[in-house]
Amino acid sequence: MSRVAKNPVKLPAGVEIKLAGQQLSIKGAKGALELKVHPSVEVIQDSGELRFAARNGDQQTRAMAGTTRALVNNMVVGVSQGFERKLQLVGVGYKAQAKGQVLSLSLGFSHPVDYELPAGIVAETPSQTDILIKGIDKQLVGQVAAEIRDFRPPEPYKGKGVRYADEVVRRKEAKKK
C-alpha cells in the first residue's frame, strides 16, 4: 500500500493557495493552476504546507488522496520552477524551428509539419535538431512532447526520428542473407 498522501506538500515562498470548497487554486511566479479536488479527499492547510486525508478508509478513497497529493505537488513545482522536456531530431535533413506558437518541423515527409502549441506551452529551438518544451502544467508539457514525438518516432534500424533527450532507442541488426 502506498503512503504518498501521508507526506505533506511544502509550499515554497511566493506560492499562494486558495481553497474554495473543492476548488484548489495555486498561484506562483510562473503562473496559476486550478484543480477540482475529489469530494472524498479532504485538504488541510497548515502553516507553509498542505496535507491530504481520505474522508473514509476504503482503498479507492485512500488512492484518490495519494493521487491528489501528487497532482498538487506537481502544480506547486510547476508554478514555482516550471517543467521542461527536451527532444532531439536524429536524421539527415531533420530540423525544427519555433515561430511564436507554431513549431515547424522537417521530418523527411514531402511537406513540413506545423504543430500549433497549446496555450501555456513555449517551445524553444537552441539548435535545429533540439527542441525544448516548457510550461507550468506537467501533464500538458509531457502531452505536447509525446505528440511531437509521434510525428516520427525513432525507428529501430538506424535510430532516425524524434526522441526524448534521455531516451535509449533499442537497435536491431539488419537482416542477413
UniProtKB/Swiss-Prot annotation:
UniProt KW Transferase keyword: no
Source organism superkingdom: Bacteria
UniProt xrefs under InterPro entries: Ribosomal_uL6-like, Ribosomal_uL6-like_a/b-dom_sf, Ribosomal_uL6_a/b-dom, Ribosomal_uL6_bac-type, Ribosomal_uL6_CS
Q: Which UniProt keywords apply?
A: Ribonucleoprotein, Ribosomal protein, RNA-binding, rRNA-binding
A molecular-function term among this protein's GO annotations: rRNA binding
- Provide a GO biological process annotation: cytoplasmic translation
Coiled-coil ranges per the record?
none
Where is it found, in Gene Ontology cellular component terms? cytosolic large ribosomal subunit
A matching Pfam family: Ribosomal_L6
Describe the function of this protein: This protein binds to the 23S rRNA, and is important in its secondary structure. It is located near the subunit interface in the base of the L7/L12 stalk, and near the tRNA binding site of the peptidyltransferase center.
Q: What is the similarity comment for this entry?
A: Belongs to the universal ribosomal protein uL6 family.
Instruction: Tell me which NCBIfam families the record gives.
Output: L6_bact (TIGR03654)
Q: How does it assemble?
A: Part of the 50S ribosomal subunit.
Q: What is this protein called?
A: Large ribosomal subunit protein uL6
Q: Please report the organism this UniProt entry assigns to the protein.
A: Pseudomonas aeruginosa (strain ATCC 15692 / DSM 22644 / CIP 104116 / JCM 14847 / LMG 12228 / 1C / PRS 101 / PAO1)
**Gene expressing this chain:** rplF
